[in-house]
Every structure is written in C-alpha cells, then in structure tokens.
Amino acid sequence: GVSSFCGAAAALEAEYTLPGISQSVVITRMAGRTPVPEKESVRSFAAHQATMVLFLSTGLLKELSAELIEGGYSEDTPAAIVYKATWPEQKVLRCTVGTLEQTAREADVTKTALIVVGEVLDGTYERSKLYDPTFTTEFRQASCSKKELGQTRENQSTEMRQEAEGQSK
C-alpha cells in the first residue's frame, strides 16, 4: 500500500522537497513508551531544518513543539496535522510549530494523525523542477513557456473566482 506520509503530501497538495528550501525528509516519531536513540531524537533532527514527518506523536504535541523549537525550528514554522490521511474522514489542519497542541485540541484530534513540519508547507515557493512544465529535462521537453504558464494560471484563477461567485448566489 501507500504509506500515510505519502497520502498526507497529497492531502496537503505539497511537495516535501523544494529547490532551495529542503531537499531532505526526516520520518520519525517522538520518544514514548518505546525510546529512540538520542542521535535520532526530534530535537537532533530539528537542527537540520529539513521537512519532518512524525508518526505516533499526536498525543505528545506540547512536548513535540518544545523539542522542535529547542532543536532549531521557530514557533512560526509552518506545520500541519493530517488526521486519517487518505481515509474518507481525513482532516487537514494547517498551523505552526507553536500552535500544534492548540490546533489538535480545537479539532478534537488525539490520535491517528501525522504531523508534518517545515518551510515547504508555506506554499509560496517555486515548485520542484521535476514537475515544472516550463523545465526541460533529459527525459522530456518543456510543455509550455513561463509566459504561457502564467496565462494559464491567470485563466484558472479567473475561472475559479467566477465559479465561486456563481455558487454564492
């Protein structure tokens, strides 16, 4: 099957690696009843500022936030809680490292969720060249120019705005 961390990326409509932002993904968990080696602690991994995906940590969000901040992430680093990724009752809760616990509490999420942390969740970055339709690689030619892509996105925005206006009437 597909791991829930991949399903979470789809739910977030996010790429876990982006040029100039993060080229690594750390998949880990908080220490709980089963410890983790100190060299693999959340605090240790946080020093890298890579995208981090955490399993089995939803019940420890206060401690998780503290470990992430002490390790090097700022309180306002983008984060997300993805409850039951890929399930019909999936919920995506966007927040920051500093508001993880409050966000989960307000949504009544106590387990069965992944935590994703990193600047890749900001959403304002250039997409990966691998998926950029204006980028030619050894295996494919660019499918459009940057100008054409800009026009396409502008048209899509106009269509979405018109659709939303039609639904609100």
Feature roles, as predicted:
Residues 22-24, 32-150, 169:
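A contiguous loop/helix-start segment that scaffolds small-molecule binding in enzyme catalytic cores
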Residues 1-31:
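Short glycine-cluster motifs
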